[in-house]
Amino acid sequence: MKKYLLFLLTMTLFARSEAFEINKDIHEFAANMESCYGVPASKVEWWLYGTDIKELALNRTAKPTEAKPWGEYKKLFITDDRIRGGLDFYLANEGDLIRAEHQFGVSRYVIAAILGVETNYGKYQLKLRAADMLATLAFNSPNRSAFFTKELQWLFIIADREDVDPLTYKGSYAGAIGYPQFMPSNFDSYGVDFDGDGKTDLVNSMTDAIGSVAKYLSGHRFIFGEPIAVQADVSGDTWQKYDSRSMRPLRPLKELTDNGIIPRGDFLPDTKATLYTLDGADGKEYWIFFNNFYAISRYNPRVNYAMAVFSLSQEIEKAVDWANDEGVYAE
């Protein structure tokens, strides 16, 4: 009996020690929120004590879907259902998409594709609390704690400013919010009241989501009418040195073509470009990325993500052209 009581006492002390460490982190975070951003520490602590640690956040960020080979990842998004959904979405929101294209200089098909990849055009039912995910990753992520701490700060800043309970924000396993899956810092920087109702609502207003995606891409130097990406053929023995594994276009296209990297299309020779090799379903695929591809990658810095958006945008555009030819309209 004494040994059992000693065991219970030891476990209790251990539990208290673990809780103390968590509380200490929370106190420091809350104090910083008040001193740096004016959000009362007591309010921040109350919010944090209402959050739950979610193993899902740690597991999914450690093994993101985007890490799959392109040939596998492509099958998740370039499907008949996703393309048909993109056509339906476009027809239902054409006015807002065209207005966003004109105002921000961003392809309406790319805007639609991002919303298609992020939340299947708003059809996904977001059930996870963004505060749970961000708090878990801020206090427990071994590699990206600083990033998620910043995003948790922004979530609380926005909630305090808008007088909203942050525990009501629904999001992804990484804490992204609403139809466009904006991280809280992007919500603040690029959120747009595109429907003119006096507030930016990325959770319930698809019009606001469309404008916000366009503003984000415009802010990352997407330029309407310029190329995004094109598949290429390679030959010779010098092209390999240009396979940079970087999505940032830094060399003139002519330098690539002079070294056996030939785009499947006509482009201005001085256009900045980069070569990237992907593992496709049928083997290696060679792609030339331009500035607009890099702009898309700023939404999510994984090449598979940007490729999915680019590919889906092309399919949506083809579907819209078909619908226009056939006289198909939104129901």
Language model: regions and residue ranges:
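Cell-wall glycan-active module
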Residues: 1-170, 175, 185-331
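Functionally critical loop-and-helix segments that line ligand-binding/catalytic clefts
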Residues: 181
